[in-house]
Every structure is written in C-alpha cells, then in structure tokens.
Amino acid sequence: MSMRTLPLLFLNLGGEMLYILDQRLRAQNIPGDKARKVMNDIISTMFNQKFMDELFKPQELYSKKALRTVYDRLAHASIMRLNQASMDKLYDLMTMAFKYQVLLCPRPKDVLLVTLNHLDAIKGLIQDSPTILHQVDKTFRQLTDIYGGLSAGEFQLIRQTLLIFFQDLHIRVSIFLKDKVQNSSGRFVLPVSGPVPWGTEVPGLIRTFNNKGKEVKRTEFKHGGSYVAAPKEGSLELYGDRVLKLGTNMYSVNRPVETHMSAASKNLASQTQESIVPNPLAKEELNLLARLIGGMEIQKPSGPEPGFRLNLFTTDEEEEQAALTRPEELSYKVINIQATQDQQTNQELVRIMGEFEITDQSRQSSSKGDDWLAMMDEL
C-alpha cells in the first residue's frame, strides 16, 4: 500500500464531484448567483490550505465509508443540500468515473496527468474569485513538487493501491454503457486501440539479440489491435498540454446520467453485513479523519440567503424509488448526535480540537465515538 495515494484519490474524486454538481445545477436551472456561490464555496473549502497540508502528509487510505463522510461534508459546504439518495448517486458516479480513469491510464505515472486535468477543469468552474484560483494553483504546485519526481515503481504502487480501493465497485453508469466502455455486469471494457504509453513502441515486432547485444533477427506478429505511437508526453507545467484526455469533464455535453447496481454488486451487498464487533483500528481512523476534516473550515449558511435542494435524479419520484431499492449495506448514513458540552470529560479530544481553527470554544463532548461525530457535525 502506498502512503502517497490519498491526495490523488481525494483530488480526483473531488474533481468528478464538481463536474456532476455543475451539470446538475445547470440542468435544474438554479439561478446563476446561487450556482456560483455553491461552486465557489465548495472549491474554496476543498482547497483550504490547512486541509491540503493535512491531506499531503504520508498516510494510508481511509475506508470507503470514512472517505464518503468527507465528501458528504464537502458537498454541504454551501447553501445547497442533497438528500441521502442523491448523495449516494453522486458518490457512485464519482467513484466509477475515477475507477475508469485509473484502469485506462496508459502508464501508472499518468494518474498524475489525470489529476492535473481535474485541477485544470476545476479552475474553469471558479467564477470571479482570484483568491480561490490562487488556492488551486498552490495545490497544483504542491502536487507537482511531491509527485513530479516519483519513480515509475512508486507510481505503480499508487495505481495498485487505487485499484484495490475500487476493486469491489461494479455500478453501471449510463454514459459508460452508451459509450460501450462498460458492460452490463458493471465491469469496464479495456480498449485494444489508441496510443500506446509514452516511451513504448507500437506492438507487432519482436527483436532477437545475440550474446553480444547485437540485433540478429526481426519477427513481425499480428497484435489484433489498432495502436498508434503516443504523439508526445503530457506536460506537468501549470498551463501545459496534458495530452491525455482522461480526467476531463465528460458532463460538458448535457445528457442525463443514471446509475444502476449490477446483480453481482447486489448479491455481494446482501452477503456482506457490517460486523457488530468493534474494529480495533476504528478509533485510530476516526482520530486521523477528524484531524483531516478539522482543516476544512466548512462555512455554515448565514444571512438571509435561502438554501436549496439539488436532485441528482430526473424527478423526485425517481429519487424516492432509488432510496427504497438501494441495498442497506451500500448506503452511507450520516448520524447526527447531540452530545453534551463537558470540556473536562475527554482530555484527548480537547488536545486534538485545540489544533483546529474553530471559533466556538464550547464545542466539546463526552464519549470518543460520539465526540468525533459531534465534531463532524459542528464543522
């Protein structure tokens, strides 16, 4: 497992989330000023410098449910609200899109170019805010400084870590099905055409060398595909040509997007029940995640501006039906707990929360699990 995977996972999934929200805000004809506020608020929260500093520290990946909690908080960082079914669908679309991109990366290192494509597109979603643009550019430099010099082996380990994270997800997405890159079981179809990885040759030729390293024979073979040489290597510069198209906004053409659980995924969900035995690693993960989310500085809606609900389904009826048919094990419920405000009951939590930039000094609580959940609700 690579300790450098989390920033790439978070930024790419966050980019996909912003693509989807932008498309739905336009599809539902949300007024321009409200849509602009939502996008700017979420992007500003996502690229908060304190949060980025925590994110880029070497660390293991969080569980799917823990990471989902981060995006739930992030999606509600402004005046927009999503109900459970829409949030489930949003997360399904995000994860399947990035899984597809990781699978199709020609080289393991190209996952960095995919990330830069997301950052480039995110900057295009920012309106009238040079400060937020500067936040994204700073993260861009942080990303290239850390990952630009990694070896091919280190990127291979990152790619393997990502694929392990995604390995049990087989959710059908209408865009992928229509483009024939996903089959009815929810698995992706790998192409046998297109550019080969940069630095490699088009298959079809075998060279034989003698013991002195001199080429003595060439044999051609049919590879069964339609490959071409890569035109050039993607740039890591701020305004460079990434060449690779993976990670760009596939929702720029306005079309509805549906998700469906495959039969295999439903069967897997029905067989996989949450264990009631406490996980000994859960406390450590909660503490780490609390530190990570503590840097997000999520703003509460204030003032007279009313909030609004965004629906990721075509109609409210579809949304309600999706909530009823989704397997219980695949829903990520957020628990809200009203915890007591006793500052002396948990010295460890007091120490951790002292590192956060929280204006309300009275936000303290009792038991460890409840403390963490209450803190999440307060952010």
UniProtKB/Swiss-Prot annotation:
> What organism does the UniProt record list as the source?
Bos taurus
Which stretch is the leader sequence? none
- One Pfam family of this protein, by short name? Oscp1
What role does it play? Answer: May be involved in drug clearance in the placenta.
Gene field: OSCP1
Name the PANTHER family for this protein: OXIDORED-NITRO DOMAIN-CONTAINING PROTEIN, PROTEIN OSCP1
Question: Does the keyword field hold Cell membrane?
Answer: yes
Location in the cell reads: Basal cell membrane
Keyword terms of this UniProt record:
Cell membrane, Membrane, Transport
Q: Which GO terms describe its cellular component?
A: basal plasma membrane; cytoplasm; plasma membrane
Source organism, top-level taxon: Eukaryota
Main localisation: membrane
Q: What is this protein called?
A: Protein OSCP1
